[in-house]
Swiss-Prot record:
GO biological process, one term: lipid A biosynthetic process
Main location: cytoplasm
Protein's recorded name: Acyl carrier protein
Highest taxon above the source species: Bacteria
Stretches of the chain forming a coiled coil according to its record: none
PTM summary: 4'-phosphopantetheine is transferred from CoA to a specific serine of apo-ACP by AcpS. This modification is essential for activity because fatty acids are bound in thioester linkage to the sulfhydryl of the prosthetic group.
Known role: Carrier of the growing fatty acid chain in fatty acid biosynthesis.
A Pfam family per the record: PP-binding
Family membership noted in the UniProt record: Belongs to the acyl carrier protein (ACP) family.
Keyword Phosphoprotein: yes
Chain ranges of the Carrier domain: 1-76
């Protein structure tokens, strides 16, 4: 599954990582060096960009780039 370009852009902008590192299987914490605050800011940026609310219990399950892409697709946003 292709990663929505906006998702990738937000991750690169929020985490300050090399776009080449943003792959579907990349873990936000282990591979992209995010901490819990980064994750909160990332979720907030996704909510704003895609005009949806991501409940905390869902946000806690978003561990990888693919998790976010799948979640947005399920919500009809990507």
């Amino acid at each position: 599954m292709a990663i929505h370009p906006k998702v990738k852009d937000i991750i690169v902008e929020q985490l300050g990582v090399d776009p080449d590192k943003v792959k579907a299987e990349a873990s936000f914490i282990d591979d992209l060096g995010a901490d819990s605050l980064d994750i909160v800011e990332l979720v907030m940026a996704m909510e704003e960009e895609f005009d949806l609310e991501i409940p905390d219990e869902d946000a806690e399950k978003l561990k990888t780039v693919q998790d976010v892409a799948s979640y947005l697709e399920k919500k009809g946003k990507a």
